[in-house]
Amino acid sequence: MNRPLSKLARFISSPKGAKIVLIAWILAIGVLSFIAPSAKKYATSSGEGSIHEDTPSAVAQKILDEQFPSKDGAVALLVFHGKNAITEADRAKISEISKWLSSDDKPKNVASALPFHQLPKATQDKMFSKDNTTILLNVALTKGLESDQIYETLDQIRNHVKQMDIGDLKLEITGPAGIAADTITLFKNADFVLMFATIGLILIILIIIYRSPLLAVIPLIIAGIVYEVVDRILGLAGQNGWFVVEKQALSIMMILLFAVLTDYCLFILARYREELKKRSSKYEAMQVALTQVMEPILFSGGTVLVAMLTLFFAVFNAYHNFAPVFSVAMVFILLGGITLIPALFALVGRKAFWPFIPKVAEKEEKLSGFWTNVGTLVKKKPSITAGILLIMLILASINVGSMKYSFNLMKSFPNDTSSRQGFEILEENFPPGQLAPVTVILKSDKEIALDQPFVEKLASLSNSIKKLDGVNTVTPEITSGLSTPNSNLPKNFLSEEKHAIRLQLTLQDNPYDKAALNTISTLRDNSKDLLTKSGFDSEQYSLHYGGQTAQQLDVQSLNQKDTIVTFSLISIFIFIMLAFQSRSIIIALTMMITMLLSYAATLGLGWMIFHYILGYDSISYRLPVYTFVFLIALGVDYNIMLVSRIKEEAQKYEWKEAVARGVALTGGVISSAGIILAATFGVLITQPLQELFLFGLTMTMGILIDTFLVRGMLLPSILIFFKPNRSKQISSIPTDLK
């Protein structure tokens, strides 16, 4: 280890230094608690609609806001549904609700509502489903509402409807506002459940591993201290607008922090226990232990930090907004790992291990146990071990090619949530395209003259769009009457500035299906041709498409680009760091390839379970990216710990023996750390969103595969074939590999 790190280890492990470190962390909590709020206060949810402002759908929305300004914000879709046809009495109740939503007594945050009660009966009849069991009322809320305000407003609507006693009719609220309200409901107590489940699980596992109350509690105290500091720093960031504090990122960050810090505790404690058996001074023992593990911890934590920083290169906000939260967290996790953990355990000393207090032993303990046997197997039969594992992992990886992805947020909600039930009722009772119509904007650089020639061109354009595959209807109907002076134009048809025409089209397919996305893609690709063939000058006029389907097409495009960028950059940066740490390109390349294979096998095996056992038709498109970032970044930790120990043992033993001893000496602590990490991510299985459930399950499988099969057996069996000429010198490994 280099001189500055040795000096730092010596200071932290000294009686005075350990006390200074502990006091500094406690003071940091005190000061931050006084001046900074909790991160939860300023946390926001970017959601699936969080796309870059330069995307076509965002440009369309900007034009829409400029040309057709509105006070309306998020839309709530009130779905009234009965098992039998809606009666006249039911219709009267719905009319009363509509009248209330248009009156002065309506909730203050309701901006406007569809005036069902004012419509002629013939028009009302057209609003019902074919079997007359379902009707939909649109309610627009005030712009700029927070999620809590949306929840309260919809709650007022539900309570009013409940008081009116609508009999056998069932009310479900879906749409953007309904989704926002349900998100609040789903995660109302989720953070507390997540935290206590994580703490409880780690506590139980640590008690089983160490059978020592202090060794079970101290790591949690350390994680709690660091978490409090990180929470307040992120709160400051949110308060001052330094960056977006993403809600979902906070939940996963908490798990990451507790799991990684507990892992660092295990790594340091394993070496500390070894040294306590060699020397009487608890401070000297910690100094030697910390000197041995500080560099691996810095490199392993550094690789995780680099992976998180790489997310800044992502354009899609759902990924980009994870970067600052996790980067800040990793900085303090690293600081806690190399300062707070050794300082606190140095002060507690041997008492931390009670009732199994390590004593100074005259002889070195003989290696034994499960991982010693694994090390022996790897040393004696490396080819067979590596071959069997490679075949297993490659076979599991093949399933990756058959994975199907969903861009429908509703599919991630539990079946019993109101927004999902409302959406599915609409799916069953109305044409699919009506669920989320597409807004078509004809933008002109000059003022539009609504004369006969223009109307004829517009009619031609409307008909051309209607003839395209995948398009069901285009409204309003373009007739010659629109050019008549003082004619009653459809609402929001021509903008006030007369620079835009607004049309609405419905698709033949579900707006979230791949076929619908392909239709929008075709429309975009053929926009100029459509304009030209209809007689419009494509230099003056342009077509823009807005709405959920157009937005999801952009999400798909951004996701594909960001997947390539993040996968490439993370792989390159981590490979460079591994090469620098191991001082060997071959070893670094081997570690990188095995981690990538582990990731592919995890996804493939996960898809088998999700699709063939759990019955999912598709999974969230974000799952592969999230899994890659965390699985690769966290998997590096164990590889670095293993290779560092092998290199250390290679100073005293022949290379094959050094590999076997490295497996034996690190197997117990790394497998324990892996179990804790897998278990903490497994807590996400309790979360209500399907995306978090599948992410937690995937990470749990991936960590266990990486810990026991890849790191525990595959990597060592491959390393056996690397034969340094000067195996007794660490510095010889990178240059002398043959």
What are these regions (language model features)?
Residues 76-81:
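Acidic/histidine-rich, surface-exposed loop or edge segments in extracytoplasmic proteins
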Residues 27-28, 38-39, 46, 50-55, ...:
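N-terminal cofactor/phosphate-binding cores enriched in small/glycine residues
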Residues 22, 74-75, 355, 388, ...:
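Residue-level detector of family-conserved "landmark" positions at structurally sensitive sites
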Residues 54-72, 83-177, 402-618, 640:
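Structured non-transmembrane domains adjacent to transmembrane bundles in polytopic membrane proteins
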Residues 47-48, 85, 318-321, 361-362, ...:
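Short, contiguous strand/loop micro-motifs
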Residues 1-44, 142-403, 536-540, 548-738:
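Membrane-embedded transmembrane helical bundles of large multi-pass transporters/channels
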